[in-house]
Amino acid sequence: NGAYLTLIERKTRFYYMIPISAKSSKQVYMQINKLHKFYGDSFKDIFKSITFDNGSEFSRWKDIEQKPKSKEKRTTVYFGRPYHSCDRASNENCNGLIRYFIKKGTDINTIDKETTIDINNKINQKKRKILGYLSSEELFLNELAKLNVTDNTIFYKI
């Protein structure tokens, strides 16, 4: 049925909504590697840590913590406590926003790339009180500029 791998950057609350063809550890690992390849050495600064829920699709967490070839540490993986969605509240909130656009139970594999990008952009462009009425996108682009990352077309390359 496919699914979305969703990640949220902690400082700016920039949201990643990455389609995966199956809810599997292999798919999650492959998509994290694509993100790492896209951001290069800046990956470790953007994703200092990742908090997953306890689904089996995150069973390759040790592999995710390391760069694929060098096995150098690239991030730290944490797990939320079972049945404590508050451990990942920002992510869960954004996951709820997806439901405005896609009904629960919809096969993600039937949703085209442009629709996914559009939904993701709408979530990231939403002004938020917690961010001083700025959007996640505005703040994230500022952070990328500090890291000298000028290309933010990741969603077009997934």
Where are these regions (language model features)?
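Short catalytic-loop micro-motif centered on adjacent basic/acidic residues
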Residues: 17, 48-53
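RNase H-like two-metal-ion nuclease catalytic core shared by retroviral integrases
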Residues: 52-54, 61, 68, 76-102, ...
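Short helix-terminating capping/connector loops at secondary-structure junctions
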Residues: 42-46, 72-74
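C-terminal domain-tail junction helix/linker
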Residues: 104-158
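Active/binding-pocket-proximal capping segment
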Residues: 23-24, 34-35, 54, 66-72
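Conserved, well-structured core segments that form or line functional sites
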Residues: 24-27, 43, 54, 59, ...
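Active-site beta-loop-alpha junctions of metal-dependent nucleic acid enzymes
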Residues: 17-42
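Short conserved beta-strand segments at catalytic cores or DNA/RNA-binding microdomains
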Residues: 1-16, 21, 32
